[in-house]
Amino acid sequence: MDSKSLAKSKRAHTLHHSKKSHSVHKPKVPGVSEKNPEKLQGNQTKSPVQSRRVSALPSNWDRYDDELDAAEDSSISLHSDVIVPKSKGADYLHLISEAQAESNSKIENNLDCLSSLDDLLHDEFSRVVGSMISARGEGILSWMEDDNFVVEEDGSGSYQEPGFLSLNLNVLAKTLENVDLHERLYIDPDLLPLPELNTSQTKVSRNEEPSHSHIAQNDPIVVPGESSVREAESLDQVKDILILTDESEKSSAIEADLDLLLNSFSEAHTQPNPVASASGKSSAFETELDSLLKSHSSTEQFNKPGNPSDQKIHMTGFNDVLDDLLESTPVSIIPQSNQTSSKVLDDFDSWLDTI
């Protein structure tokens, strides 16, 4: 139903009710009075005419009552189904300003609530937990031992809030040094090389000895797979040490022989008659050289170094020592020596050349 038809039906309904109210009213019958008898007679003569007119023309408005009620019901149902715009348009600027004002008021209320809560928590936290934080861990130990701990509450102006989560880096570094390396890195000890593991364990043992001197020593913790690795590496180290000791002993023996030769030549220089003792010294020199060559050949047979570069270094050092020894021999002894000494020297030089 259109808005125009709805307006027409409302208008007809109002007119119908106004006419109906007028038609219902009955004409007033003039009262009987003694003062105007003439008017009473005139009215009595006119009243049957009016009653006839009313009876002759009955009202037919009752015929439209049902139709008007049906039209009103249909208009109400259609009006509830169809959304009729209240106005031609809305003021969007006004609506936006109202929404912004509401949002700002909500934000301010939330901020006020949060700030008050933050202030309350901060004050309570600083007063209750402040002394324990300043003690740097002592409060936690007191928790573990006894729950009844004393909190210092001072409301004076000299009260200062301790720094939240304040750390002493020096103390932390010292405590980390007391911990093993694999525990600091959260890895298995088998993954670390042995020297680093040993150094970390020695540091830990050195740091723990003064602090735990009054505690009995506990049994060492054996990690599976670690003992075999340590035993193998310790055996390798022992072998290296034995080889080095053998080489050092043999080198010391060679040096002792060379010292004897040098001492013999120095005694030859100090003697007043070198010509008389030349034959004796040459024979002693031959014997010393023979023993030296035998010892050197035996060391070469039993101890063959793994690297040829090490062998060359030892041989070059030995050759240099012998060259210095030969150069230090006196000139007076060399021409007076026997042919045997010259042959021995030639053989020795040829042997050095072959090396």
From Swiss-Prot:
Record's keyword annotation contains Transmembrane: no
Superkingdom, natural source? Eukaryota
Instruction: State if Mitochondrion is listed as a keyword.
Output: no
Localization per Swiss-Prot or TrEMBL: Cytoplasm, Cytosol; Endoplasmic reticulum
Which residue windows does the record flag with biased composition (Basic residues)?
A: 7-28
* Region of interest called Disordered, as start-end residue ranges on this chain: 1-60, 296-315
What does the UniProt keyword field contain? Cytoplasm, Endoplasmic reticulum
**Polar residues bias: start-end ranges:** 41-53, 296-310
**Annotated InterPro entries:** Exosome_cofactor/PTGS_suppr
Chief subcellular site? cytoplasm
Q: Name one GO cellular component term.
A: cytosol
Q: Give the disruption phenotype, in one or two sentences.
A: Shrunken non viable seeds due to arrested embryo development when homozygous. Alteration in cuticular waxes. Decreased production wax with dramatically fewer alkanes.
Q: In which tissues is it expressed?
A: Expressed in taproots, lateral roots, root tips, leaf veins, cauline leaves, inflorescences, flowers, and siliques.
Q: Which PANTHER family match?
A: PHOSPHORELAY PROTEIN, PROTEIN ECERIFERUM 16
Main function: Together with RST1, acts as a cofactor of the cytoplasmic exosome and connects the cytosolic RNA exosome to the SKI complex. Acts as a post-transcriptional gene silencing (PTGS) suppressor. CER16/RIPR can, like RST1 suppress the production of small interfering RNAs (siRNAs) from the CER3 locus, which is involved in cuticule membrane and wax production, and in the typhine and sporopollenin biosynthesis of pollen.
The subunit field of the Swiss-Prot or TrEMBL record says: Interacts with RST1.
Q: What is this protein called?
A: Protein ECERIFERUM 16
